[in-house]
């Protein structure tokens, strides 16, 4: 049995990042709404509790409180932002509106050598005070400490930026240690979880396989399962895990909608039919998909058509597999969060995800989602532990609608052929080019990155087809051909992203190869937009 950390969600958009930081410390955790019952908290039996941030105001919304059982359990509690404020109010302190609201970077002074912050700082002042570079996002502030608490941290505009009652193991910070902008945030969360709470760091994917296999066997029994295999990381790892558990009780359905990457179908079939000896039904439905996409230019409409046609094709195949009782999906935790479908139901919906909600209930199948509570990095670790090749497991994310949302405007077979070849060349150049000491000296990467491929140094990279033509010259003749844009970003969480500063030589080679090898494209541009304001995908 794993030690568990209970994260109570008060509605913050970054609550899932708290969970990710805890998991990175190899400790299991779950997110649940702040209004769970006292009985639930006691039955959960956490080693510690973390209270999240919120968009709400502590003194205006009196419904957003932690259950009384949190304070009765006798376990350590960490309050973050709003979590600090509700801790203060519930334990006898005072919170009020701040005249100086803080949103963004701040330098915070640590006080009192508490167990949480002792020895953790980014720099020291001339007087020897430890300072932390943190990320703030609050309009209220704790004005009066609860009985038994001492000051733990402060900023010029927030005199009580942290507080602690070490006798009871209660700690609270006004900043957000879960976001990457707080430089020592991960260290602070690890300190709380591992040292203060004393949780065992035994949440390791290699060990998780045995538990997951046992759970799948218990759920499924001797019934059969079907899974839509896309070639992406999530569905591939889900397929490998389920196949490990139940073997030939699993049938994978691989639908080729004509919008896959170059040679993707062959790679998937070679892996699952050839190496894993799994049952795979291969359906070439490219004519059907491209036919329904003809004349459609709106991005959301394209997504809906691709989703609808996939359901139709998959449903037809599922009906042929009459013994199947389960539908398996590669849904992972961020999918659930982004669709506003967390266990808390408090996060605002960001976008509709193609996995969440799944296929229509008319299939009459039970849902099997063995990766639902895992983050992407955990899924990748699991995939490697299951024996999938790293080049498959560590591929960059690929949208469910495939190249359909990387072709701007109407989708045509001609456009898809041009794009997949251009994209393959760009990815090949990224994989084949390693960062050099000169790149590090120029600030394109860190010194520790020297020797790594630029594919591994980017989080997502791809080509985009622009349905416009430009004039060019090749040989002695004039050309009038299409334009493609290259896109590469670096990010830790995909919620924000920076465009990747790739070496000019790499971009030059990719451009020259695309123009020379892909007949029909005569101009290549590079997208230098961050997220925000742009999104990572163009559509």
UniProtKB/Swiss-Prot annotation:
Quote the CDD domains the UniProt record gives: GATase1_GMP_Synthase, GMP_synthase_C
Q: Which controlled-vocabulary keywords does the entry list?
A: ATP-binding, Glutamine amidotransferase, GMP biosynthesis, Ligase, Nucleotide-binding, Purine biosynthesis
* Catalytic residues as annotated in Swiss-Prot or TrEMBL: 81, 176, 178
EC id? 6.3.5.2
Residue ranges annotated for the Glutamine amidotransferase type-1 domain, each copy included: 4-202
Q: Which GO terms describe its cellular component?
A: cytosol
Q: Where is the GMPS ATP-PPase domain?
A: 203-395
Per the record, the pathway is:
Purine metabolism; GMP biosynthesis; GMP from XMP (L-Gln route): step 1/1
Q: Does the keyword Nucleotide-binding apply?
A: yes
| Pfam families linked | GATase, GMP_synt_C, NAD_synthase
InterPro entries to which the protein is assigned, alphabetical: Class_I_gatase-like (IPR029062), GATASE (IPR017926), GMP_synth_C (IPR001674), GMP_synth_GATase (IPR004739), GMP_synthase (IPR022955), GMPS_ATP_PPase_dom (IPR025777), NAD/GMP_synthase (IPR022310), Rossmann-like_a/b/a_fold (IPR014729)
Q: Which reaction does it catalyse?
A: XMP + L-glutamine + ATP + H2O = GMP + L-glutamate + AMP + diphosphate + 2 H(+)
Q: Where are the transmembrane segments?
A: none
Residues where ATP binds: 230-236
Does this UniProt record's set of keywords contain DNA damage? no
Q: Name one GO molecular function term.
A: ATP binding
Q: What is known about what this protein does?
A: Catalyzes the synthesis of GMP from XMP.
The cross-references to NCBIfam families, in alphabetical order and at most eight, read: guaA_Cterm, guaA_Nterm, PRK00074.1
Q: How does it assemble?
A: Homodimer.
Q: What is this protein called?
A: GMP synthase [glutamine-hydrolyzing]
Q: Gene name, please?
A: guaA
């Amino acid at each position: 049995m794993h030690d568990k950390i209970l994260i109570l969600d008060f509605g913050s958009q970054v609550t899932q990042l708290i969970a990710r930081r805890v998991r990175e410390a190899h400790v299991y955790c779950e997110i649940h709404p702040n209004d769970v019952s006292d009985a639930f908290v006691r039955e959960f039996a956490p080693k510690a509790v973390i209270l999240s941030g919120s968009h709400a105001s502590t003194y205006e919304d009196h419904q957003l409180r932690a259950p009384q059982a949190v304070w009765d359990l006798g376990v350590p509690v960490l309050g973050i932002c709003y979590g600090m404020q509700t801790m203060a109010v519930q334990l006898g302190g005072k919170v009020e509106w701040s005249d100086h609201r803080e949103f963004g970077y701040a330098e915070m002074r640590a006080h009192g050598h508490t167990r949480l912050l002792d020895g953790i700082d980014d720099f020291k002042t001339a007087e020897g005070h430890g300072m932390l570079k943190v990320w703030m996002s609050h309009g209220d502030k704790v004005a009066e400490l609860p009985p038994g608490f001492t000051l733990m941290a402060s900023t010029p505009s927030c005199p009580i930026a942290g507080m602690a009652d070490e006798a009871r193991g209660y700690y609270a910070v006004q900043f957000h240690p879960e976001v990457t902008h707080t430089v020592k945030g991960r260290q602070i969360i690890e300190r709380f979880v591992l040292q203060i709470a004393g949780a065992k760091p035994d949440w390791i994917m290699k060990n998780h396989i045995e538990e997951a296999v046992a759970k799948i066997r218990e759920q499924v029994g001797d019934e059969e399962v079907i899974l839509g295999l896309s070639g992406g990381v999530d569905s591939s790892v889900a397929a490998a895990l389920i196949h490990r558990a139940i073997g030939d009780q699993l049938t994978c359905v691989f639908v080729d909608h004509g919008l896959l990457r170059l040679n993707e179908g062959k790679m998937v079939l070679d892996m699952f039919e050839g190496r894993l000896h799994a049952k795979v039904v291969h359906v070439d439905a490219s004519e059907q998909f491209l036919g329904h996409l003809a004349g459609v230019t709106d991005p959301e409409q394209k997504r809906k058509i691709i989703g609808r046609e996939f359901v139709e094709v998959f449903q037809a195949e599922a009906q042929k597999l009459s013994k199947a009782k389960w539908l398996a999906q590669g849904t992972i935790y961020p999918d659930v969060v982004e669709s506003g479908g967390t266990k808390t139901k408090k996060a605002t919906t960001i976008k509709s995800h193609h996995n969440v909600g799944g296929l229509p209930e008319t299939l009459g199948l039970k849902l099997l989602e063995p990766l639902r509570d895992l983050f992407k990095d955990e899924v990748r670790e699991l995939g490697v532990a299951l024996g999938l090749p790293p080049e498959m497991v560590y591929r960059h994310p690929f949208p469910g609608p495939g190249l359909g949302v990387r072709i701007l405007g109407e989708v045509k077979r001609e456009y898809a052929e041009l794009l997949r070849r251009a994209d393959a060349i760009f990815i090949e150049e990224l994989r084949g080019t390693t960062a050099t000491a000169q790149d590090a000296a120029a600030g394109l990467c860190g010194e520790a990155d020297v020797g790594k491929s630029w594919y591994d140094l980017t989080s997502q990279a791809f080509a985009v087809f622009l349905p416009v033509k430009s004039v060019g010259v090749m040989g002695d003749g004039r050309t009038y051909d299409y334009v493609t844009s290259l896109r590469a970003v670096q990010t830790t969480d995909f919620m924000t992203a920076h465009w990747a500063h790739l070496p000019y030589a790499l971009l030059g080679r990719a451009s020259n190869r695309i123009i020379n090898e892909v007949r029909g494209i005569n101009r290549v541009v590079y997208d230098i937009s961050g997220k925000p304001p742009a999104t990572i995908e163009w559509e």
